[in-house]
Regions:
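Helix-loop junctions on the cytosolic side of multi-pass membrane transporters
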Residues: 130, 134, 175-204, 283, ...
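Short hydrophobic/alpha-helical segments at membrane-entry points of transmembrane helices
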Residues: 18-19, 105-113, 225-226, 311-317
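Structural signature of transmembrane alpha-helices in multi-pass secondary transporters
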Residues: 26, 58, 148-152, 266, ...
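Intracellular juxtamembrane helix-capping segments at the cytosolic ends
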Residues: 37, 123-136, 326-339
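C-terminal transmembrane bundle of multi-pass solute transporters/carriers
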Residues: 64-68, 75, 79-90, 95, ...
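Cytoplasmic helix-loop-helix junction between adjacent transmembrane helices
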Residues: 113-154
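Helix-loop boundary and gating motifs at the non-cytosolic
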Residues: 2-61, 215, 219-266
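Helix-loop-helix hairpin linking two adjacent transmembrane segments in secondary transporters
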Residues: 102-105, 148, 152-189
């Protein structure tokens, strides 16, 4: 039996290492930009609805462009595509930093930038995971996906440490640094091999057709249910991220530094979830693993709404990100493993399109917060919550998500029994 040496593992080769490091640097810039924009919007508007709308605008490009990016990623060289997208991200950030420096900004200008940033974010998310698979191949896709997601989380830790300190003093500096991060990540992958080992064989006459993904979904129950579950967790689970600045400020009475700390904590929890994927990546029952992770995430969202003290909030948020990180990685692994090699980009495009359901979750949270803040409730609610609106929204979302995941457990047999 041949020994598996470090040299035979794709993770120890230069192509994957350069991709991993590029993802880390890009993520540092992206998360730093997201934290900074969230802080600035809440500072200039002091409105929960404006913050939630900002997150909605960031996700809108996913609905519009994700399927097309998935098709393009199946047709062109993914290394070049990824490098170009990262470079375009750096250009946008540099221009926005100039606007902030000269104080030429308002809420509308910020929203235009957030939309542009959302375009870059969704395109990179699809392309980098497809390219990671090209390098590591189907045998190591679990570890490859987890490692690139780990790089993303480490980048988030870097961003969390610096972003809160920087944006509270200089609005333009975080965006200028993020522009440099994106530029470096774009350059870093250029020396990689022209063709990766597991890149799909392409027909030059092949043209992207929107009907292809519809045909795949019609005949692939696993991918279809995966996308439905993604929509469910996006609306009622991941949407808690949209009110993180509000939770830190109104529930915990924190400031920009505390928001940065919570960003670090989220990423640390995410890294634990990713390490579990790496350690048990050869486990075949990934569908069952995904459903358990989604259920754990559901309970954590519910209990986050009951967390009034710093310690309880930290423990629940940390646990929530262990489960959500596992879900995120498993979604991408199963999406690619459930289709043929030539359709991986389309599958990831369809999955990313499902992420576009996030704004509906933001809308639900916003409506609940508005209702609670508008109507004069008795002290029955106030005695359990520091900030009744956002906390009650998390309780309701968590409860609904628990029920929906249990229904999926019961009826989604093919996903539950899916083996990679």
């Amino acid at each position: 039996m041949p020994l598996i040496t470090n040299n035979s593992l794709p993770f120890f080769k230069k192509d994957f290492f350069r991709l991993w490091f590029a993802v880390l640097i890009f993520a540092a810039g992206t998360y730093q930009e997201q934290v900074s924009v969230g802080y600035i919007v809440y500072e200039i508007t002091n409105s929960e609805i404006h913050v939630i709308f900002m997150y909605t605008v960031r996700v809108i490009p996913i609905i519009i462009f994700s399927n097309y990016i998935g098709y393009i990623a199946d047709l062109v060289n993914r290394k070049k595509l990824l490098s170009i997208i990262m470079f375009l991200g750096s250009v946008g950030l540099f221009l926005f930093s100039l606007l902030m420096y000269f104080e030429i900004y308002n809420y509308s200008i910020i929203m235009i930038f957030v939309f542009y940033s959302g375009c870059i974010w969704s395109a990179v998310m699809i392309t980098q995971q497809s390219y990671s698979y090209d390098i590591v191949g189907p045998k190591f896709v679990s570890q490859g996906t987890a490692l690139t997601k780990g790089a993303d989380r480490i980048g988030g830790i870097v961003a969390g440490y610096f972003s809160g300190k920087l944006v509270s003093n200089y609005f333009h500096i975080p965006f200028l640094l993020s522009a440099l991060y994106h530029l470096c990540s774009s350059i870093l992958i250029l020396p990689n091999s022209k063709i990766a080992n597991y890149s799909p064989v392409r027909n030059n006459k092949e043209k992207p057709k929107i009907s292809e993904i519809l045909y795949i979904l019609k005949n692939n129950n696993v991918l279809l249910v995966l996308i439905i579950l993604t929509i469910t967790t996006e609306i009622f689970g991941f949407s808690h991220n949209s009110i993180m600045p509000i939770l830190v400020k109104d529930v915990l009475r924190g400031d920009a530094d505390d928001l940065g700390f919570m960003m670090i904590l989220r990423q640390l929890g995410g890294i634990i979830g990713i390490l579990l994927i790496i350690a048990f990546g050869n486990t075949q029952k990934k569908g069952l693993w995904l459903l358990y992770s989604a259920l754990g995430m559901s309970f954590c969202v519910f209990f986050l709404g009951l967390s009034n003290s710093n310690l309880i909030f930290i423990v629940v948020l940390f646990s929530l990100n262990i489960f959500s990180s596992s879900c995120d990685s498993l979604y991408q692994i199963i999406a690619q493993k459930s289709v043929s090699n030539k359709d991986r980009g389309k599958a990831l495009g369809a999955w990313t399109f499902a992420l576009g359901s996030g704004p509906l979750g933001y809308l639900i949270i916003g409506l609940i917060i508005t209702a609670v803040n508008t109507y004069d409730f008795t002290g029955l609610i106030n005695q359990y919550y520091n900030a009744p609106g956002p906390q009650l929204a998390l309780n309701l979302n968590g409860f609904i998500l628990i029920l929906l995941v249990l229904v999926t457990f019961r009826y989604a047999t093919k996903l539950r029994e899916f083996k990679s």
